[in-house]
Regions:
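PLP-dependent amino-acid enzyme catalytic core
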Residues: 1-314
Length: 314
């Protein structure tokens, strides 16, 4: 990898969600909420960060988790362990072969009943969807894009490509909104999918969210066509499901730069970046910013999530 590349790190323990949560929990405090609800997989980085931030803000975290990989009761690991240490109220739901989003949609009646019960007891709940991908949350990444371009300018770097992982879509939507605010059409945004999505609707939903960010921010700009490229070919077997090629690039980055990525998000995104470079889809000599979204806690999760990364090599 060309050493002239740039890496924007958003911490290797926590993920990019802290950008969203800065805005979301400010909104929760403004509304006088004392409880935060959110949702995700059992090893969700978003859930762990939300629980952490809620505690920092004096609010009680309540989470519903879809068990894509079933945790062992006597061997709680990684993000789920941190959720437990934080004293989070945890409800684990069987996934039954469904995606996390599908699991949550099927159980929405449970969440609404729980929220209503707490309201009857005098509590006020702030409800954050999967990934924190709302117009308020995604605004954190509009700010991120503006900051990143300012840093590139101060470094004398014209950014040709900005590459990041994309799951619930809030990160990419925020980046697109930030690019629109700057009238920046010289930087190609690339999202590397980490879970299987409907290609016919996924990109358009991100555009709609980006426009909602712009509207919420009071900006005049709007996006009328896809301002990014999304690659779905690096998902592998699915969300939270590792594969050899991605794990090989996780090792490569760790062994050449001492930088850790995870097998769920940033590792698949980095593998996608490397493959785009190797195949010439990102031309030699390009200036590339890789937005490292953290999440290294996944390296300590269940074997089904990390794959062959735990094999000791001579």
């Amino acid at each position: 990898m060309d050493k002239a590349g740039r890496l924007l790190r958003l911490d290797t323990l926590r993920r990019q969600q802290i950008r969203k949560l800065e805005y979301l929990l400010h909104d929760a405090k403004q509304q006088g909420c004392d409880t935060v609800f959110t949702y995700g997989a059992t090893q969700s980085n978003h859930v762990m960060e939300t629980a952490t931030a809620a505690r920092r803000c004096g609010m009680r975290p309540v989470v519903y988790l879809g068990a894509i990989v079933e945790p062992q009761p006597n061997d709680v690991r990684a993000n789920l362990l941190l959720d437990t240490i934080l004293g989070t109220e945890i409800h684990i739901l069987p996934s039954c072969g469904r995606s996390t989003k599908e699991t949550m949609e099927a159980n929405d009646h449970l969440f609404q009943a729980h929220i209503a019960q707490l309201a009857a007891q005098g509590h006020k709940v702030y409800n954050i969807p999967i990934g924190g991908s709302t117009p308020i949350g995604a605004a954190g990444f509009a700010e991120c894009h503006i900051e990143t371009m300012a840093q590139c300018e101060s470094a004398g770097l014209a950014c040709d490509y900005l590459v990041t992982a994309t799951g619930s879509g809030g990160t990419l939507a925020g980046l697109a909104a930030g690019a629109a605010m700057l009238h920046d059409d010289s930087t190609q945004l690339i999202g590397i999918q980490v879970g299987k999505k409907d290609p016919a609707t996924y990109g358009q939903k991100i555009v709609e969210l980006a426009n909602s960010v712009l509207e919420t921010a009071g900006a005049q700009e709007r996006i009328d066509k896809l301002p990014f490229v999304i690659h779905s070919e690096y998902v592998g077997p699915g969300y939270e499901k590792p594969y050899k090629e991605a794990n090989d690039d996780i090792r490569y980055l760790a062994r050449t730069e001492g930088i850790f990525t995870d097998p769920v998000y940033s590792g698949k995104a980095f593998h996608g970046l490397m493959d785009l470079i190797r195949t010439g889809n990102i031309p030699k000599g390009s200036n590339v910013v890789f937005l490292h979204t953290g999440g290294a806690t996944a390296l300590f999760s269940e074997p089904d999530i990390i794959g062959d990364l735990n094999q000791i090599q001579a």
